[in-house]
Amino acid sequence: MLDHQFLGRSALVLGLSAALAGCPTGPNGDDDDAGIPILGDGSHDIESLDMAVIADSGDGLNIPRDLEFHSQRPDELWIVNRGDDSSTILLDAGTSDQESVFRGNTGGSAHFLAQPSALAFSDDGTFATIHETDDLTQGPNGTPEDFMGPTLWTSDLDIYDGGHGGHLDMLHNSPNGMGIAWEDDRIFWVFDGYNDSLTRYNFNDDHGPGGTFHGDAEIERHVAGEVRWREDIPSHLAYDQDTDLLYVADTGNNRIAVHDTTTGERGANHGPGYDVPADMQYTVDGGDCSTLIDGEAIDEMGRPSGLELHDGKLWITDNRTARIWAFDLEGNLLDYLDTGLDDGALMGIEFDADGNLYAVDAENDEVIKISVKSE
């Protein structure tokens, strides 16, 4: 069993958490003295930057909702598509040598990659996806409607198919999952829309490609009822390995929340018992989940969705206004960019090693790359 005691961190880090709980949400005006180049350096104008479409429906994009660079092959950009339960992989992404690879929409994709909301890579090159559905995914005589949760995958392109044969494991306690973030080893956090919680999944040992055994996992349901999903809009997550803080785009509550994952105490066991013994799935009660950024106090924030922790800053997209913000880790607004994209377009965002910004456009089935103009 995972040795996870919920005893909190050192006094120094606990002090940081307390400060976050009480800190202001940041200024609501411009800060031209602290402009960020990739957001227009205080101009907030997309015309001050280079924005290019690097992938579209011809590459298999079909309502793309999240994207992430491979943890070991940093030139590969992986994208998940809700429209047909699929994924698109861009090789040499954003360069003149770019090629696209399509996976999914195959045997088992309607369950194992059902309406994906988000993906997250671990450091060993495996990755996990989470899915927005609480419908039957294996036919009228198959598994129940709530038999959904995160899927663990190999990223070996000779094996990965986006379906049953390419999956390494799957757990089934979080229908309507809206975001996912990697913690360590085989541990992932999920924005659990069905239970309005942040749920920690430890897959432990996977069953191998195409297997079926799920019984060695551990599932912890944190801060139940304190976050709220919004249908059709992913609520992305970012886990900070240095502080054990989980940052949350809490879309339904129009805020950015922060959960101190080391707080709380083990509570009661919970169902449904589809995967693991009863004592291996339980609530964690009394954990600290506070508001870092109140969307009501930020101009044009109404449906925060994409969230990335990069370069010591939090980067947030708004699904309604297509604005991208950067905040410091105390919740202070640093800069923002108006992309000019459609209502409903922006969801997941990502950065490459050179600091270029990538985002999905779910309305137009595109991935865009934003770069600072060369002089």
Please tell me what each predicted stretch does.
Residues 344-375:
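Blade-level signature of beta-propeller repeat domains, shared across WD40, Kelch, NHL, RCC1
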Residues 58-74, 109-126, 167-187, 221-243, ...:
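Beta-rich, blade/repeat-based domains predominating
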Residues 130-149, 200-201, 259, 266:
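Short, conserved, GDST-rich strand-edge loop motifs in beta-rich repeat architectures
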Residues 90-99, 154-161, 201-213, 259-279, ...:
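Short loop/turn segments immediately following beta-strands, especially the blade-tip
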Residues 72, 81-84, 131-134, 192-195, ...:
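Short loop/turn segments immediately following the C-termini of beta-strands
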Residues 19-22:
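C-terminal motif of bacterial Sec signal peptides marking the signal peptidase cleavage site
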Residues 35-61, 284-293:
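A short helix->beta-strand "capping" segment at the edge of beta-propeller domains
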Residues 76-80, 126-129, 187-191, 245-248, ...:
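Conserved beta-propeller blade signature
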